[in-house]
């Protein structure tokens, strides 16, 4: 049976549970709930862990318990424990440089200033791993300085209006993840990258 490893990035704890920076957590929590699976803390994996079987695949879901800036420690622990290749993992992460509702699948790339991705790249010593980036939009600028308040934006709570958009994004990403073992890679990439919230 094919095994699929999904790693959602975020910060543990109630304080961050509904923040934009926790979209990776939120998406995998939605996926796990769909299959009536629950997350349990696995110290050896430095993550909360959930698994289920679907479409002739075993899905292994991980929510690092290391806080965002040390996500690489959890990813390294997962790779070491399961003895898997990098191409078997899919990292799900928020992206402030993408408009809200946009999705981008990339097989490699820089951190783009995202501390979670930066930590993974530093620990693994490579940029070559699958990542699904979900847009949260840019933070608003202040009139006084015209600078972006990035920290307060990414750590801020998702609004009701944003949630209505992100719920549709989650559906598209989850559908795509469910098809990883039944559709060609090009199909999955196009399904994610072509998503347009205006056409839903």
Swiss-Prot record:
It comes from the Bacteria. Coiled coil: none annotated. Keywords: Cytoplasm, Hydrolase, RNA-binding, tRNA-binding. The record marks 94 as: Stabilizes the basic form of H active site to accept a proton. Belongs to the PTH family. This is Peptidyl-tRNA hydrolase. It catalyses: an N-acyl-L-alpha-aminoacyl-tRNA + H2O = an N-acyl-L-amino acid + a tRNA + H(+). One of its GO terms (cellular component) is cytoplasm.
